[in-house]
């Protein structure tokens, strides 16, 4: 696969500084990702911090229900022998969600291999499945490139309660959405093979299980481990850490408010809003995930239907850890207390929220790992590349100023010089009316006003004529406009980067599962954007 590395900027200050001016934000992180020494320091810190045997048992217990490639089994054995982990993760989106989920897994696998060689110590990739997330709007859709632009497939769930994705059954609504997706796709070369695997993944499964099956299908032969934080065994293992987070809730709240204020003073938009009185955890009630808050001496659910005294809640935490769920603020540090996380492969948003959690990690008695910025990418199909060449355009031009590109191309196609012609006409009319007003000034102010009003009506007619000329011009060049729209919907579908919208299974149905191996053959660098040319 041909590829090209380019630079695309970020609007958010913190991410931009993290990538190109790290010193300005270094105070918010424990390790500098751009300094190789950081990985040695992190490895030294991790020594003797975890129990490899217990970690192996934890992962094996979860993975025993899945068909595992030999490479996954080998990496589990490496965990047992003290391997470090490159971690990444995402909610279990529909058919893995947007492309960036795939890129996270790819980058974690690549970094694990690179860091193993750098440190001369085994490092394995692990994908954390955020099945506890209860926002159905995050996991109930996918987009793919349609004939007229982005096409959406949505799972029409009938149960809209705050049920974690890992407790939401895939059948029947998700299966119906898959069938709709299959029916809308052209008969691509690999379509049948791909949809056979998709249907196997979602058969008799919840969304978390189906996601895990798909990720293991795509990346198992490359050794990617997966783990679901909703697993009851993980709750039991981590109940002491969650209890510690509750006991130190006040200190965590103060730390968040402190960094929030500090980042605002530096002109950085904080990624997390501190929530006063939040317990930093949720309770599962009738399968719904409800936030817990402190109200005086009590712990209450946000819906007001559950209430504990402090002592009762501590007892509940001890007896029923599987009924509690950490929020993002404390989940990340709990992950680092359980897993020997050498580095975390983070997207732009994650870089932002990790930048608010350094002191939370310290309160919890640990450090955050090296935060590695995930590469970003654009898949460019042959037809897209052909259109770029036809208009002599660079992809970054479309990313940075599509509207400007659109108008420049239309101007190039305008051999009549419509803009210049009407500009000259308007200047000529304005000049003529100015001369007229000067010559007829003796007729008085009322006549001057009448002349001005008349000019306004004339210019309105000129504007109308110009708009009609532009309309005829666009219609005459409609095929070029359609190609420009095609380019936009490939690079900026829904006005977002391609990787944040389109789903990988459209491309797998067209180019085959070998596409994954091709991605893993590219030496991606952290924080860079790549143009990936499909063939």
Swiss-Prot record:
InterPro entries: Bacillithiol_biosynth_BshC (IPR011199), CC_BshC (IPR055399), Rossmann-like_BshC (IPR055398). It comes from the Bacteria. Residues 420-477 form a coiled coil. Keywords: Coiled coil, Ligase. GO terms for molecular function: ligase activity. It is an enzyme of class 6 (ligase). Pfam families: CC_BshC (PF24850), Rossmann-like_BshC (PF10079). The keyword Coiled coil applies. Its EC number is 6.-.-.-. Belongs to the BshC family. Involved in bacillithiol (BSH) biosynthesis. May catalyze the last step of the pathway, the addition of cysteine to glucosamine malate (GlcN-Mal) to generate BSH. This is Putative cysteine ligase BshC. It comes from Carboxydothermus hydrogenoformans (strain ATCC BAA-161 / DSM 6008 / Z-2901). The lineage of its organism: Bacteria, Bacillati, Bacillota, Clostridia, Thermoanaerobacterales.
């Amino acid at each position: 696969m041909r590829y090209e590395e380019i630079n695309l900027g970020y609007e958010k200050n913190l991410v931009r500084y993290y990538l190109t001016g790290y010193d300005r934000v270094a105070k918010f992180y424990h390790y500098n990702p751009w300094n190789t020494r950081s990985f040695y320091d992190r490895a030294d810190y991790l020594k003797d911090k975890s129990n490899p045997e217990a970690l192996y048992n934890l992962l094996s217990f979860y993975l025993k229900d899945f068909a595992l490639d030999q490479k996954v089994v080998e990496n589990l054995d490496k965990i047992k022998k003290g391997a470090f982990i490159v971690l990444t993760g995402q909610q279990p989106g529909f058919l893995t969600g947007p492309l960036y989920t795939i890129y996270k897994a790819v980058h974690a696998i690549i970094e694990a291999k690179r860091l193993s060689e750098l440190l001369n110590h085994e490092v394995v990739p692990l994908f954390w499945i955020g099945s506890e997330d209860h926002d159905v709007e995050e996991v109930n859709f996918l987009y793919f490139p349609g004939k007229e632009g982005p096409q959406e497939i949505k799972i029409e769930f009938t149960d809209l309660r705050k049920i974690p994705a890992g407790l939401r059954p895939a059948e029947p609504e998700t299966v119906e959405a898959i069938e709709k997706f299959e029916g809308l796709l052209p008969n691509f070369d690999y379509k049948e093979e791909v949809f056979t695997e998709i249907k196997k993944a979602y058969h008799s499964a919840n969304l978390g299980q189906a996601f895990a099956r798909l990720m293991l299908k795509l990346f198992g032969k490359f050794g990617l481990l997966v783990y679901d934080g909703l697993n009851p065994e993980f709750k039991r293992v981590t109940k002491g850490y969650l209890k510690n987070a509750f006991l130190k809730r006040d200190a965590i709240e103060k730390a968040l408010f402190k960094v929030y204020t500090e980042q605002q003073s530096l002109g950085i938009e904080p990624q997390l809003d501190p929530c006063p009185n939040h317990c930093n955890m949720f309770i599962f009630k009738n399968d719904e995930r409800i936030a817990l808050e402190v109200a005086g001496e009590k712990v209450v659910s946000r819906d007001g239907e559950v209430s504990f005294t402090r002592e009762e809640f501590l007892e509940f935490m001890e007896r029923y850890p599987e009924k509690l769920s950490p929020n993002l603020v404390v989940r990340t540090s709990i992950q680092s207390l359980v897993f020997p996380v050498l580095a975390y492969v983070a997207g732009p948003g994650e870089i932002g929220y990790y930048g608010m959690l350094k002191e939370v990690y310290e309160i919890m008695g640990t450090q955050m790992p090296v935060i590695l910025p995930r590469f970003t990418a654009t898949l460019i199909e042959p037809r897209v590349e052909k259109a770029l060449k036809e208009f002599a355009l660079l992809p970054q031009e479309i990313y940075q100023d599509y509207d400007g590109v659109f108008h420049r191309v239309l101007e190039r196609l305008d051999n009549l010089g419509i803009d210049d012609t009407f500009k000259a006409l308007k200047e000529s009319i304005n000049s003529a009316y100015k001369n007229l007003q000067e010559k007829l000034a003796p007729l008085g102010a009322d006549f001057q006003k009448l002349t001005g009003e008349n000019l306004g009506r004339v210019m309105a007619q000129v504007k109308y004529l110009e708009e009609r000329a532009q309309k005829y011009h666009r219609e005459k060049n409609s095929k070029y406009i359609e190609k420009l729209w095609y380019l936009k919907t490939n690079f900026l579908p829904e006005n977002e980067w391609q990787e944040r919208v389109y789903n990988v299974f459209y491309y797998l149905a067209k180019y085959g599962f070998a596409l994954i191996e091709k991605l893993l053959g590219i030496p991606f660098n952290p924080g860079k954007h790549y143009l990936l040319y499909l063939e």
